[in-house]
From Swiss-Prot:
One of its GO terms (cellular component) is ribonucleoprotein complex. Residues 73-87 have a biased composition (Basic and acidic residues). Belongs to the eukaryotic ribosomal protein P1/P2 family. This is Large ribosomal subunit protein P1. Residues 65-89 are annotated as: Disordered. The lineage of its organism: Archaea, Methanobacteriati, Methanobacteriota, Methanomada group, Methanococci. Keywords: Ribonucleoprotein, Ribosomal protein. It comes from Methanothermococcus thermolithotrophicus (Methanococcus thermolithotrophicus). HAMAP family: Ribosomal_L12_arch. Forms part of the ribosomal stalk, playing a central role in the interaction of the ribosome with GTP-bound translation factors. The gene is rpl12. Part of the 50S ribosomal subunit. Homodimer, it forms part of the ribosomal stalk which helps the ribosome interact with GTP-bound translation factors. Forms a heptameric uL10/P0(P1)2(P1)2(P1)2 complex, where uL10/P0 forms an elongated spine to which the P1 dimers bind in a sequential fashion. GO terms for molecular function: structural constituent of ribosome.
Amino acid sequence: MEYIYASLLLHSAGKEITEDAVKAVLSAAGVEVEDARVKALVAALEGVDIEEAIEKAAMPVAAAAAPAAAPAEEPKEEKKEEKKEEDTTAAAAAGLGALFG
């Protein structure tokens, strides 16, 4: 992975990804450099549009808001039921008051 990170670092810095540049980054990071891996990486990245590859690899965040919307409706229904119970209790109290009033 260090080799890929080195190439991404060079790309984000606007530098050309060459064998010498990758070796320099890896050496600066204290990584023991394998020439064959560096050559393979540079050869594999030749002609690749890294920006396009990053955009394609980036996965959009799944819409998790849809399940959250359903619980928001439930408290509204509970409030309506509570109001109905309060109205029924108030009506019953008023009716009893009329009996004794």
